[in-house]
Amino acid sequence: MSHNLLKGKRGIIFGALNDMSIAWKVAERAVEEGATITLSNTPIAVRMGQVDALAEKLNAQVIPADATSVEDLETVFAKSVEILGGKIDFVLHSIGMSPNVRKKRTYDDLDYGMLEKTLDISAISFHKMLQVAKKQLSLIHISEPT
């Protein structure tokens, strides 16, 4: 049941891969509540996942991007503002990946290079998103430090 809680709001949702993804469910619910959105994930995730099907279902556009790349994020935010017709009201960062886990490395056998990649993908990319949005003035509201 929709209550139009997000009617007229514009958002970018990062990380939808398939119908088991948190980002997927949030995207469905956001649109159900009246939001218009763009979707973003890595180019390989777009090719290998089902995000195109979600985009079609939600009448959303997919903007492939590597969230660890500031240049790619600049493109996502600029294109989203253009596609959605104005500044962005919300961003969902639902991104996480660990090469150590994928390679089944145990805690006492971590590869630190892979751990750095994990942090870049899963955490630092969020800061990069906010930094890009602030520089481009893409978001409706970003608090300033006092």
Where on the chain are the PLM-derived regions?
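Conserved hydrophobic beta-strands of the Rossmann-like cofactor-binding core
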Residues: 10-14, 88-96
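Catalytic Tyr-X3-Lys loop
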Residues: 89, 104-130
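Conserved glycine-rich Rossmann-like NAD(P)H-binding loop of the short-chain dehydrogenase/reductase
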Residues: 35-51
